[in-house]
Amino acid sequence: MGKSSNIVFDRIKEERQMLSFFKIFQRADLSSDCMRALPYSFISKVSEKDFSYKMVIRAQWGKTWDVEVSKNPTYYYIETRGWDLFVSDNALGQNEFITFTHRGNMVFHVNIYEQNGLEMRKPRKFQTMGPSSGIKKEEGENSLIDVKKEEESDESPGRAEFLVRKKKTEDSKSSKKKMTRNKVKKKSKSKSKQVLDGVPEFKITIRKSYLKFLAIPKHFVDDHIPNKSKIFTIRHPNGGSWKVLCLVREIRTIFSGGYSKLAREFPLMVGDKCTFKLIKPFEFVLLTSKKNREKMDQCMID
């Protein structure tokens, strides 16, 4: 007991003599420029000998993440690719308090403290999937309740709307259904024309908070999203794409890291009707309706 206490004390004493900084990982701000920035008061004290644009983040259980450091005219910051992997691997975003202690040569040891104040000493376990159901029964029942609530309130502005179409493969199709599919294909004027009718999709009306992060409907998550946080590609129908972190949580799943950049550059506006089509296992094409936007612009002109 006494020996263990001395080891902890010696570690704290040693780390107090090293340069360090902390960050609080909030769900809506996981990959913002501010979140990835290295504090000026910290970076100004790192010697030229110790500094490198190659940075290593090391957890207590030994896992490491290689990240790139870049510089703009104002500050140094961590590139999103390695940062988002660190965030997703540790399922961060629940107001964790994390210290970054510089051990030299841009190697940082991190200590992760959960919202309850306890230190995380081993990686979080992601929810396990059953061989047939694809998700634990209890979580599936909760998902149904959440979706029902969304469906009951979808008349209010900004509420998530949900639609999943399953591809029909039967040979004996009625001529009426074939005509309907042909009409849908003719209406498509972009790259989405290559997407067959029946691909999984969900619809969202953009509200203010959805310019920072986006909650994905539960039914869609259960049917089409893996049970572990992953990086997805979201494409513009006219070209261009963004890497976005799909952060999986027991309560809900969201697009977080990289999503706010997508919202700025696409661009998305409050009131836009958006359709996310899952064209590949980890790739969406995003379609938007500009009717509301055109009305808003017209009102401003008038």
From Swiss-Prot:
Compositionally biased tracts (Basic and acidic residues): 135-174
Membrane-spanning ranges: none
Location(s) in or outside the cell: Nucleus
Record-linked SMART domains: B3
GO cellular component terms listed in the entry, alphabetical order: nucleus
InterPro entries per the UniProt record, alphabetical: B3_DNA-bd, DNA-bd_pseudobarrel_sf, REM_fam
Keywords: DNA-binding, Nucleus, Repeat, Transcription, Transcription regulation
Regions recorded as binding DNA: 21-116, 199-292
GO molecular function: DNA binding
Region ranges (Disordered): 123-192
Biased composition (Basic residues): 175-192
This protein's name: B3 domain-containing protein At3g17010
Lineage per the UniProt record: Eukaryota, Viridiplantae, Streptophyta, Embryophyta, Tracheophyta
